[in-house]
Amino acid sequence: MVRKAVIPVAGLGTRVLPASKAIPKEMLPVVDKPAIQLVIEEAVQAGIKDIILVTRSGKEAIENHFDKHYEIEAELARKGKTAILESVQNILPDDVTLMAIRQPEAKGLGHAVLCASAAVGNEPFAVLLPDVLVDCEDGEVHDLSQMIENFTQESATQVMVERVADEDISKYGIADCS
């Protein structure tokens, strides 16, 4: 069973400048949550228990978001704002661990995943890219859950790809699916 996820978050966010100049792109809001939280929520829903962020300096806001914030929690409790207090306290379930590993230098996505190898060990794991959010069409089975199920049944590596226009090929990693 896949219980670990590696989430590379060490990028510079150049595709979303100027929005990412002062805020990590993974922390940009999608309605009322940062994008990284949506990615981690999908991972948790799929059964992931160990989340490994591969990060760099300047990305501390990501780790801070998933940490306890006692001052905010105390203030919300004092004001009786229980609904928002619960949402703040439940950002990361108690049975899920989150760790951060630094990528010492920018050598690309493959290197970022390699930086997590000691934490992953010899276990199967998922790599989640937090700058691409995919909405579930049927509203029930999320892509990661389906990929983990396929991996468990087939014992074969799973890769999700998306078609892009020819003029956008230089912006993405490319897979030839022919």
Residue map of PLM features:
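Conserved beta-loop-beta/alpha segment of the NTase-like Rossmann-fold superfamily
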Residues: 71-75, 82, 88-177
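N-terminal glycine-rich phosphate-binding loop and ensuing alpha1 helix
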Residues: 2-81, 98, 103, 139-146
